[in-house]
Regions:
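Generic, ordered loop/turn and secondary-structure boundary motif
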Residues: 63-68, 154, 163, 169
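A broad, low-specificity signal for short, low-complexity segments enriched in glycine/proline
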Residues: 16, 83, 130-132
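Function-dense linear segments that define catalytic or interfacial modules
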Residues: 20-126
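Polar, glycine-rich mid-to-C-terminal structural blocks
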Residues: 1-24
Length: 172
C-alpha cells in the first residue's frame, strides 16, 4: 500500500502506474493519510487490506459473519452481527502483558479497543445495498457499545465499517 500525506502529482501517479505495469499488473492500495487522521487521530498505518486504520503497535480485531446464511432473515442477520460484535469487544479485554509483546501493544489495545465485523458470503446476497450495510454497521456499533457498557469499560474508539472479506467472500 502507498500512504500519501499530500496530494500526489500527476507525474507521481504516472510513475506508480508504470511500476505497476512493470510488476505484472499488481495494484497497491492508496491511503489518504490526511483523511485517515481526520477519521482516526491515532492513525499511523493500516492492516494489509487497508480497511482498518491502526495506531502504532495496534492490530486488527475482527470477527466474521456469513451473510449468505441469512437470506430472507434480516432480523437473524442483525442479531448475528450484534452478537459477533459483542464477542469482538470481549476480545479487547485480553491481557497482552505476556512477557513477549511490548507493553505498548497492551496499552494501545486498552485505549483503542478497536472492533470490526467482517462479512463473508456477500456474493450470495446481491439484494443487500448501501442502506442495509449502513444498518449492519449501526448494529455492529450497538453491539460493541452495549458490551463495553455492561462491562463498565470504555467504548471502542472505532467499530470498523462492516466490510467484505475479499476472496474469502467468494468461496464461503
Amino acid at each position: 500500500s502507498l500512504l500519501f500525506n499530500h496530494k500526489p502529482s500527476k507525474d507521481d501517479i504516472a510513475e506508480i502506474f508504470k511500476l505497476m505495469v512493470a510488476a505484472g499488473g499488481s495494484e497497491p492500495g492508496f491511503i489518504n493519510g490526511v483523511s485517515a487522521r481526520k477519521r482516526a487521530p491515532w492513525f499511523k498505518g493500516a492492516n494489509p487490506c487497508v480497511e482498518i486504520l491502526l495506531g502504532n503497535k495496534s492490530f486488527c480485531n475482527l470477527t466474521e459473519t456469513d451473510v449468505g446464511k441469512f437470506k430472507g432473515d434480516s432480523a437473524g442477520l442483525r442479531r448475528a452481527i450484534y452478537i459477533a460484535s459483542r464477542a469482538n469487544y470481549r476480545q479487547t479485554c485480553v491481557n497482552l502483558l505476556d512477557g513477549i509483546l511490548q507493553e505498548a501493544w497492551h496499552l494501545n489495545n486498552e485505549f483503542l479497543r478497536l472492533c470490526g465485523v467482517g462479512l463473508t458470503g456477500i456474493v450470495r446476497r446481491p439484494d443487500l445495498g448501501g442502506y442495509e450495510y449502513e444498518e449492519l454497521k449501526r448494529t455492529a456499533t450497538s453491539g460493541a457499545y452495549s458490551m463495553a457498557d455492561e462491562l463498565g469499560l470504555p467504548r471502542p474508539k472505532n467499530v470498523t465499517t462492516v466490510k467484505p472479506s475479499g476472496t474469502l467472500s467468494k468461496i464461503m
